[in-house]
């Protein structure tokens, strides 16, 4: 796909990366890609950790338009959503994301607010409140 679209100078596949090294690689990316085939409810309804990694790094991303991604994107506008994982959709989405500087800058800026809201420090408060209510 990379060679067929002459993107060797723009796309670098790093292979397997140790979790401890992932953040230092992620912050160097221009755009993130969070794509899963719709081959079951698990993929269709879940949110990938990398989705949040890109947000925390302030990196706009390309995501397939599944409900959880759409819901967060409607709130924060941090990703370009594509209808499916066909080659044409991925190529068109990436080209659009990479060529529209205004969109890219807006998504990048929006990641800041999303990062402030979507993190463990905020989720911890919600979880503690939940348990306090549960315990009465």
Question: Which residues make up each language-model segment?
Answer:
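Hydrophobic "lid"/C-terminal helical patch
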Residues: 2, 94, 127, 131
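A charged, aromatic-enriched C-terminal amphipathic alpha-helix characteristic of glycosyltransferases
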Residues: 24, 89, 102-133
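Conserved donor-binding/catalytic loop of nucleotide-activated donor transferases
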Residues: 27-30, 51-60, 64, 76, ...
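Short loop/turn segments at beta->alpha junctions
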Residues: 17-18, 47, 65, 86, ...
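Acidic donor-binding loop of glycosyltransferase active sites
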Residues: 26-44, 59
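Nucleotide-activated donor-binding/catalytic signature segment of Leloir-type glycosyltransferases, i.e.
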Residues: 1-23, 31
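Conserved acidic donor-binding segment of nucleotide-sugar-dependent glycosyltransferases
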Residues: 75, 79-87, 96-101
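Short alpha-helical segment that forms part of, or immediately flanks, the ligand-binding pocket
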Residues: 20-23, 45-57, 67-71
